């Protein structure tokens, strides 16, 4: 799975949790908080993405991520090493 596909999985799950963002033009620099995701939304998005990617990693490994582009990068690295 390539980085673009992981980014698409992220976007799909973001839009599922935050349907008001459907049609939004997502950029790697977008931050979930700025997009309107509260802590529960963010946890749900992460859980759904990890499930979609069949990853089991501690959430703490994602804590330093600043935006969805960085999140896609970290997830890509985890998929490659899984």
Curated annotation (Swiss-Prot):
Carrier domain residues are 4-79
Q: How is it modified after translation?
A: 4'-phosphopantetheine is transferred from CoA to a specific serine of apo-ACP by sfp.
Q: Which domain of life is it from?
A: Bacteria
Gene3D superfamilies recorded = ACP-like
Its main localization is cytoplasm
Pfam families from the UniProt entry: PP-binding
Cellular component GO terms, alphabetical: cytosol; membrane
What are the BP-aspect GO terms? antibiotic biosynthetic process; lipid A biosynthetic process
Residues with O-(pantetheine 4'-phosphoryl)serine modification: 39
| An example molecular function term from Gene Ontology annotations | acyl carrier activity
Q: Which InterPro entries match?
A: ACP-like_sf (IPR036736), PP-bd_ACP (IPR009081)
The name on file for this protein is Polyketide biosynthesis acyl-carrier-protein AcpK
Q: Which organism is it from?
A: Bacillus subtilis (strain 168)
């Amino acid at each position: 799975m390539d980085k673009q596909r992981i980014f698409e999985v992220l976007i799909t799950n973001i839009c599922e949790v935050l349907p008001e963002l459907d049609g939004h033009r997502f950029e790697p620099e977008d931050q979930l908080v700025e997009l309107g995701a509260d802590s529960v939304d963010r946890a749900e998005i992460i859980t759904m993405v990890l499930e979609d990617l069949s990853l089991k990693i501690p959430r703490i490994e994602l804590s330093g991520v600043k935006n969805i582009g960085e999140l896609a990068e970290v997830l890509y690295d985890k998929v490659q090493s899984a």
